[in-house]
């Protein structure tokens, strides 16, 4: 497995003190993912990312995150879920291993577990969860509060 890019974005909470932020997105996710896409040469995330592991501490967080990652059009994430696009046989499988709500939320270790799942997938070792053709995986992790947090994005692929 090869790390194609890794980005961090930190928020000091200033966006929550202005009326310009309505709480429907996470600025750090948008910043970190766009930087990662740019550096990894990804122009069409929805078509190029083939699997994701995201910080799904709450159901709404996963939905908002998929929009912030440009894997769903803003305001249309629920349609993508209902259409099955994030299912294991969908266009962009998400949380193939069940995510945080399945594994629990080991604070400090959540990101490592996500990367491990992408490692298993890219090396064909995920057993019954194995995707047919994983090419690029995206890992998204958060820490903090919606208005004041740090976001980590990793894009991984096979070692060429």
What annotation goes with each model-predicted range?
Residues 71-84, 126-132:
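A glycine-biased, small/acidic residue-tolerant capping/turn segment at secondary-structure junctions
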Residues 17-22, 55-78, 106, 145-153:
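Short glycine/threonine-rich loop-to-helix capping motif typified by GTGT followed
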Residues 8-13, 50-59, 99-100:
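A short beta-alpha structural unit
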